[in-house]
Amino acid sequence: MKKLQTVRVLLNGASGKMGQAITRLIAENPQKNLIVSATRGPGQSDIKESFDIVVDFSTPQGAQEAFLLAKKYKKPFLTGTTNLPEPFLFTLQSEEKIPVFFAPNVSLSVYFFTELVKQACNMYKGYQKALHEIHHVHKKDAPSGTAKRIATEMGLPAEQVTYERLGETVGTHSATFSSALDEITLTHKATNRDLFAASVLDIATWLVKRQGGFYTMSDFAKFKLKEKKK
């Protein structure tokens, strides 16, 4: 059997919670054929080490700097950084020369939860809708990027999303549908940040094989579903 080539990751935001989780999972899962060959700090404009993909979980400014680095070296760019400026999002969505992946939440289970909420919106059109999210006290954006994404699918303005910041909560999202007769609540609760970090490893392995263009969780989910049918 032909040995798979190791994918060298340039990790932007390695000191953050997600960066640390990604680094640890790469080390714990050698069968994934990924290594962190380089890390990048704020304001660092160049990298001496070789890399095959830029993975970013940092800040809006850090994400933009990391993208320029990916463009410079013509390497795939994967980011899960939230609260990105609209002009930069448009730039990512318009990219054609390198593979670019963006998702405010990289978990497949959260993606399918969002799809379930969309179906519920179609089923309970006469119901009052509400969305509540809980994250750890260190999270800077509120509501979260994931909550904004779910709210969009529910037809709710971001201002109507309620939120809490409690302890070290990884992430909980609850969509509620209420009528005079009953109430339905759909909830996704992440209990470990490894849920997201493990998905990043799979997305990175997938993205390096893609052609130039913009990709989302929808594209990755379709790939995974096809893979399961084989």
Predicted regions and their residues:
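ADP-ribose/adenylate-binding Rossmann-like module
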Residues: 69-87
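Rossmann-fold NAD(P)-binding glycine/threonine-rich loop
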Residues: 81-101, 108-119
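Short glycine-/small-residue-rich Rossmann-like dinucleotide-binding loops
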Residues: 58-59, 82
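A generic structural signal for well-ordered alpha-helical segments
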Residues: 26, 70, 93-95, 124
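Hydrophobic beta-strand scaffold residues
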Residues: 34, 77-78, 99-102
